[in-house]
Amino acid sequence: MTISLKTAPLLEVSNLSVDFRTDGGWINAVDDVNFTLAPRETLGLVGESGSGKSVTALSLLRLHDQRNSRLGGSVRYKGEDLFTLATSRLRQIRGHEIAMVFQDPIHTLNPVLTIGRQIEEGLRLHHGLQGREARKRAIELLDRVRIPDAARRIDEYPHRMSGGQRQRVMIAIAIAGDPKILIADEPTTALDVTVQAQIMELLRNLRDELSMSVILISHDLGLVSEFADRAMVMYAGQPVETGPIDKIFDEPLHPYTEGLLSAIPDLDDDLDRLPTIPGSIPEPSRRPPGCRFAPRCTFAQASCVKPQPIMSLTGGRASRCPPRLPTEECVL
């Protein structure tokens, strides 16, 4: 889907930061996150586990424990800053204007309520539907997400369903409020390849039918490349590269993005061993000064020990790593 750059953003995230309270004091988990989301646009958030993708997504709706977290920056939805809204107004937006499909539905769905009751709860809250009217609409939603024999299965409990069916129920709950933005946090986790493809096809169809914007969180670059218009690559709590999905895949600017792409297996390559990125993401309390990727980077320079702001470039792209010459080698 091609999105006009002149379209006013639906969501604007500026200087977002998230800190968590620990026994040793406050620890920063995410910082310097900036992005926009246009109507009907899909943005992919990608990176290794621990890069800050889910922390970023949960913060958009202030879903972190308020006693042990603190948020900085702003998240504006249609001009309203979600970080300063009264709780009553925020509840109106959650699920209705902005909805979320969480990871691992077996731990998200209530095991003692039927799936019908859980869908009807959102219909009552956001549309005022009750009784038979709510049940009828819940069955329609199950049909829409392709649950077979929805009129019978609406009275089943989550444990009676497969992983793929539970994820479809989560999607039905999410779209019950007719949201303008859907946040899908690793929607295909723990599903086999065939079911993954079915879930992504379902999300694609719903996105187009309901004219939703989507924030897709995934470590699967191939999946994001087929679904998203733009991508934001995150590493150690910061975005390191953003841009149109085709540009990021064809001409990555940041060494971390290059490393992720090179680790994707190619059926045409005859390799005994896949390329890997040495090392691992540092813990939040042990992040290096300057470029956080420098200790793992094969192109690290002496200047990388200094803080690296993200630089806006042409074509809607941005990178935290300055353009380098082909002959440059690591000097650290």
From Swiss-Prot:
E.C. numbers: 7.4.2.-
A single Gene Ontology CC term: plasma membrane
The ABC transporter domain, residue ranges: 11-261
Single GO term (MF): ATP hydrolysis activity
CDD domains: ABC_NikE_OppD_transporters (cd03257)
Enzyme class at the top of the EC tree: translocase
Superkingdom field: Bacteria
Any one of the GO BP annotations: peptide transport
Keyword ATP-binding applies: yes
Keyword Magnesium listed: no
Oligomeric form and interacting partners: The complex is composed of two ATP-binding proteins (BAB2_1052 and BAB2_1053), two transmembrane proteins (BAB2_1050 and BAB2_1051) and a solute-binding protein (BAB2_1049).
Protein name: Putative peptide import ATP-binding protein BAB2_1052
Species in which this protein is naturally found: Brucella abortus (strain 2308)
Top-level taxonomy: Bacteria, Pseudomonadati, Pseudomonadota, Alphaproteobacteria, Hyphomicrobiales
